[in-house]
A protein has these predicted regions:
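Short aromatic-glycine-enriched beta-strand elements
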Residues: 19-32, 90
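Beta-rich strand-turn-strand
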Residues: 53-89
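OB-fold/S1-family single-stranded nucleic acid-binding modules
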Residues: 50, 83-103
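Acidic, gly/ser/pro-rich intrinsically disordered tails
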Residues: 1-3, 16-23, 38-43, 58, ...
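Glycine-rich strand-loop-strand elements at beta-sheet edges
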Residues: 35-63
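OB-fold and OB-like beta-barrel modules that bind single-stranded nucleic acids
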Residues: 5-11, 31, 65-77, 96-99
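Short coil/loop residues immediately preceding or within conserved phosphate-binding loops
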Residues: 2, 6, 12, 26, ...
Length: 119
């Protein structure tokens, strides 16, 4: 079955490179994508959780910072987890295969995004 997604948005925070116990590079970050409803209507912003592994994670952490526009290509995946009360939860993430610059270095318009806890 087909499971492909391409998403462009601005990084809400600087991505941080981590390593698994076996030394594999990984980063997870959130991107903001404006949704435009039409002329004269206010834009709304959607936020997407993104995960990248290995050399893709290293590339993103080296060249992208908060506010930079990024375009990612990959697939959607679900991840199950338990909250503090022990309830089962599910998150949907974009698992990145490729990442691309979607702005020029001159366009360092960082943008003001609300903190994650403001949604």
């Amino acid at each position: 079955m087909l499971n492909r997604i391409t998403m462009t948005g601005r990084l809400v925070a600087d991505p941080e490179l981590r390593r698994t116990q076996s030394g594999v590079s990984v980063t997870s970050f959130r991107i903001a994508n404006d949704r435009d409803y039409g002329k004269g209507e206010e834009k709304e912003t959607d936020f997407f959780d993104v995960v990248a592994w290995r050399s893709t994670a290293e590339f993103i952490c080296k060249y992208f910072t908060k506010g930079r526009m990024i375009s990612v290509d990959g697939r959607l995946q679900t991840r199950g987890w338990k909250d503090r009360e022990g309830n089962n939860r599910v998150s949907i993430e974009i698992l990145v295969d490729n990442a691309y610059f979607a702005d020029s270095k001159k366009d360092d318009a960082a943008g003001d995004f609300p903190a994650d806890d403001q949604f």
